[in-house]
Amino acid sequence: MKIAVVALGKIGLPLAVQFAMKGHQVIGCDVNQNTVDLVNKGIEPFPGEDFLGEYLSNVVNAGHLVATTDTAAAVSESEAVVIVVPLFVDADGIPDFGWMDAATAKIAEGLKPGTLISYETTLPVGTTRNRFAPAIEKISGLKAGTDFHLIFSPERVLTGRVFADLRKYPKLVGGINEASTEAGIKFYEAVLDFDDRPDLTTKNGVWNLGTSEASEMAKLAETTYRDVNIALANQFAIFAEGANIDIAKVIAASNSQPYSHIHQPGIAVGGHCIPIYPRFYLWNDPVATVVRSAREANAAMPAHAVHLLEESVGDLTAKKVAVLGVSYRGGVKESAFSGVFGTVTSLLEHGAEVLVDDPMYTDEEITALGFTPYEAGSPVDAVILQADHKEYKSLTKGDFPGVKAIIDGRRILSPNNFEGVAFRCIGQGDLK
């Protein structure tokens, strides 16, 4: 089978490689010429994805994967098209379909009868049927569900472990009609493998969600649930700080009961998924007060971490504060919606001099993000740990001459390594 994958980003490229490893002929499409050139050389354009470098080199050398900037031409040669183009939201939470609409137009230009189109980008409910189907029909002159198949099948993977997650989680498929759904199921059964999951009541594999709307909502529901759960954990954590309770012990105790699944609190909820997809849901359901309140609560956590620091050292004016972590989580070079932005902004509003460190970023990259790099070993008044990189776990007060306070936003540091320093964690009282 010949397959076009549109957008070779941190999800799209591993998907293209996965399809190619199953023996299919894959054309990867991207608007970035540099990305296309690197892929055609078998070089991964971004670091941090397990096995991608090895697998990419293998499938390119075997002739199973090529890349191009000509999406319409690639689609015209393909039996199936998979779209993983990013969808953004503006400051008011309104989806910005610019990139998605442009990619959809290019796909429609090259579309031929009998092709399957699968959107994997997370979308508001109804988008596949009500926005993209008419757009494709208008440009191509073909009828959705009759001349071509159209489905929504959300990506459910985490960057850094895409190949493992593709095997681990059921692939959800829903089409605009039954024929499209069946075509989608047949396609994904041909391109994916699945781990045995005895914990599931339905066998792991490709799952029929019935409609594109159900499939769209399934992805929004699973990610919005996580955001709401984390917000609840964060509110528990803030209360625990004032009551001198260790919330980590409370959550562990609560979760020993099988119906309790409280997530872990922390300084921020970042990345391309959890901070964004609840806003898609709110676009569909603007009266969802629980979802809106949860999003606002999580967005306020970086400022809460700065409040803890202010409680520990007093006025932050002219204080040197090192923020550890540009990435939104440990082990991944990705700054999308990272807590570093809210943390730095809040510190600057309090008059602090802010320095930023991350072992995965060069000083030049940190500067390009608008931050001042921290020089390892230089004196600071305080430290806020924002990302749980493994490199940070063994840090001691000797690494930060003159440090008077530590705020551990991810609870990975050892208080014993900071004897004599005011040490605070999210969800725990003062550990002086």
Regions found by a protein language model. Give the residues of each.
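Structural/interface elements that position substrates and couple domains in central-metabolism enzymes
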Residues: 1-432
